Amino acid sequence: MTDQQKSDILQGTLDLMVLKTLDAMGTMHGYGIARRIEQISAEALAVNQGTIYLCLIRLVQKKWISATWGVSENNRKAKFYAITKRGQKQLAEETENWERVAGVIGKVLELAPARSK
C-alpha cells in the first residue's frame, strides 16, 4: 500500500486506539505504539510520529496514561507509557461511544439509496 493510499486517522480516534493498545499490550514506548496501530490496521493507517507524541503528551496531562523513562530493546533511552485506572475508565467510555456512533453510521449507510453513475 502506498503512502497516498494509507488513510489518515479519523479525528478523535487516536486517543482511543492508543488507550486500547496500551490496555492490550502493556507498557510500550511511543514508536512501538504507533507501529502496533499500523500493524493491526494491516498498514492501512499511517501514524505520524509527531501526531503520536502530541497525543501521548495530551493523554499524560489527562492522567489517562503514565510515562516513565527506561531503556528500549535497542538499548536506547526511551519514554514508556502505561494506561492508568482513569485511562481504563476512559477507554471503556470511548469504546462504548465509538460502538454507538459506528452503529448509527452503519444504519445510515444501509438506508441511503445508491446513486446511479
Show where each model-derived region lies:
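Accessory beta->alpha helical hairpin/"wing" motif in late/C-terminal subdomains of nucleic-acid enzymes
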Residues: I83-G87
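Short, Lys/Arg-enriched N-terminal segment that forms or immediately precedes the first helix
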Residues: M1-S7
